[in-house]
Amino acid sequence: MRWIGIDPGLRITGFGVIDVDGQKLTYVASGTIESGDPAKGLPERLGALYAGVKEVLETYRPEQAAIEEVFLNVNPRSTLMLGQARGAVIAALVSEKLPVAEYSALRVKQAIVGTGRAAKPQVQEMVKRLLRLSRAPGTDASDALGVAICAAHHSQIPKAITSALASKKRSK
């Protein structure tokens, strides 16, 4: 199963693509999509994010998508802008008929590092280790890969429960 994880941002949006085969995670690609010059209008910048995500989807053809949820910022304007960027990204994902899972930053950090209070360098290091990379990707790409890994692990939980219940029934 191929997953794409997205760490949305108005200025820079990170993406990470992984293949999942049972418990095996394989790195495919990661990078960033930039919305362009902040002097450009918001609609143009959102359009650039949408187009950039569509290009990544066409290149890597994921089967599932996951995106980080918006967190409440001290600055309400920043939260609103992030929400709009996230909306442009989600629109690109659903335009390709991808199922989209959403995870909080806390949940992603718990899945990757084991604590929701992990710092970005800790997330980068664990992503590097989990995907057996020679060096850690940049913070935006690492965060996006973390979202994909978190989603892949959470998608395995219902299968594991179903399998355990089926095996319990057979043993009776």
Swiss-Prot record:
Classify the source by domain of life.
Bacteria
Q: Which GO terms describe its biological process?
A: DNA recombination; DNA repair
State the free-text cofactor note: Binds 2 Mg(2+) ion per subunit.
The answer to whether keyword S-adenosyl-L-methionine applies is: no
User: InterPro entries from the xrefs?
Assistant: RNaseH-like_sf (IPR012337), RNaseH_sf (IPR036397), X-over_junc_endoDNase_Mg_BS (IPR020563), X-over_junc_endoDNase_RuvC (IPR002176)
Q: What is its EC number?
A: 3.1.21.10
List the active-site residues: 7, 68, 140
Q: Return the similarity comment.
A: Belongs to the RuvC family.
Binding site residues for Mg(2+) 1? 7, 140
What do we know about how this protein assembles, alone or with others? Homodimer which binds Holliday junction (HJ) DNA. The HJ becomes 2-fold symmetrical on binding to RuvC with unstacked arms; it has a different conformation from HJ DNA in complex with RuvA. In the full resolvosome a probable DNA-RuvA(4)-RuvB(12)-RuvC(2) complex forms which resolves the HJ.
GN (gene name): ruvC
Name under which the protein is recorded: Crossover junction endodeoxyribonuclease RuvC
Q: Name one GO cellular component term.
A: Holliday junction resolvase complex
Q: Which Gene3D superfamilies match?
A: Ribonuclease H-like superfamily/Ribonuclease H
Taxonomic lineage per UniProt? Bacteria, Pseudomonadati, Pseudomonadota, Betaproteobacteria, Burkholderiales
- The entry marks the following residues as binding Mg(2+) 2, namely 68
Which subcellular locations apply to this protein?
Answer: Cytoplasm
Q: Does the keyword Transmembrane apply?
A: no
Q: Name one GO molecular function term.
A: crossover junction DNA endonuclease activity
Task: Name the PROSITE patterns for this protein.
Answer: RUVC (PS01321)
Q: Kindly list the cysteine pairs connected by disulfide bridges.
A: none
Alphabetical keyword list: Cytoplasm, DNA damage, DNA recombination, DNA repair, DNA-binding, Endonuclease, Hydrolase, Magnesium, Metal-binding, Nuclease
Needed cofactors: Mg(2+)
According to UniProt, the reaction catalysed is:
Endonucleolytic cleavage at a junction such as a reciprocal single-stranded crossover between two homologous DNA duplexes (Holliday junction)
Which Pfam families does the entry mention?
A: RuvC (PF02075)
Its biological purpose: The RuvA-RuvB-RuvC complex processes Holliday junction (HJ) DNA during genetic recombination and DNA repair. Endonuclease that resolves HJ intermediates. Cleaves cruciform DNA by making single-stranded nicks across the HJ at symmetrical positions within the homologous arms, yielding a 5'-phosphate and a 3'-hydroxyl group; requires a central core of homology in the junction. The consensus cleavage sequence is 5'-(A/T)TT(C/G)-3'. Cleavage occurs on the 3'-side of the TT dinucleotide at the point of strand exchange.
